[in-house]
């Protein structure tokens, strides 16, 4: 996504990191003879009271291999928009997108770092070329760079949608199309892929049903009707815009009982083939991962699965 100056790294693999004030989620994926091997996946505690150098100190102590490094932006630090591509040369694309996005941001466009990535062309002729534009807060990108200053092979700041796309593309049924859904208490995200191709992403504004309606049983924790509506809108757009056969394989990102309840509800309401993602089955893991670690490190794993270096 947001590429930094290229720094040399050896081996075919990548380190993925998500950064919080009190912890780092770490994943290392190596690619050996076409297989992705998750060699390390853990949460590293950070003493937030130790000051701005605490994260770098934790990374130094972790004794990481010399591999390219990706960090992942948090949801509050960027805006993702599907827009018609400006008719300009590639070298001018980011500048053109900056002004196209300025009215859609809740921060000054001058304070944004812009990048773009393509989606397949629409199925019907006469429609303009579409692409995703990402506007990240410059301060967030700079924070990532500062936290990873001790890692000379840090080269990419990624976004959650592309990390989830990497995971969805690894699902065995992805050749026929896969939807990967990740939810929390107040927000969610769905990505649609077919084979290795990223087609669509949608962010969801969710609410906890127990707050909205006083529902407290296990199957009523989330606003499932709203999730189903947003999911159906995404699938309808995918079929209509790209003239693709329907996706009926839905994978729920690990999130403890929340994911299990959601999978149960959506399987009943849609008739889709629905399951909760298990990284132990998706990848070759050198150490089995408990569900809590999978949930905490999911985006770091997706970032570590990235193989391309730059987007444009």
Language model features: what each stretch is:
Residues 1-312:
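Hydrophobic/aromatic-enriched cytosolic interaction surfaces used to assemble or bind macromolecules
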